[in-house]
């Protein structure tokens, strides 16, 4: 039945309004779903980016620490050379006494045949107190190994404090001044997160050179022999008659420590 013209028009408008509202709700619902999807994707992207940054940070962290350690040690070496020169010029008698004490110590090792070398408790205690000679940081020099791209400060006495900072002369072996009938055992760990220390010692081959700098000079040594031993083979680092030597010592195999890796070097 046909309704009046006004009533039909009103119904049409109501139907049209209802359709527009439903369409508007659908569009709004679609927009909300799209926004939720965008927000979710954004959160996933941010979360993934954070994970990526954390992963990169973990991978780069040791390299960053090693870079800072290298910068720090280079600064220490410059300071060592400047301080040594200044103190030596200002008080040459003190440095002359230090040299004589080191020389006498080396000679005493020959006389007593390194009788305390088998005592593990003797290794950690420095035989000479550098503080008594005005060397407050305890650095006796430094070792440079070009093939390993390595420079480390050298301390007297292989205690944990010294070995956490660099390389150490093993007490009951020769002082770092060279000379006939000497063999300084230089020990270092296979590395920390902040410094590689002797981690790459296996890069050293026969004929490679290392350098030892003390308060007076820089000495050059050449790799002559490499050997893997057990920790109780202490005779392997004894002084060899008529030779001027440095023996590098570290744990082996990396990252374990049930053996010792020795690199024998002779003065050039």
Where in the sequence are the language-model features?
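Gram-positive cell-envelope targeting signals
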Residues: 1-75
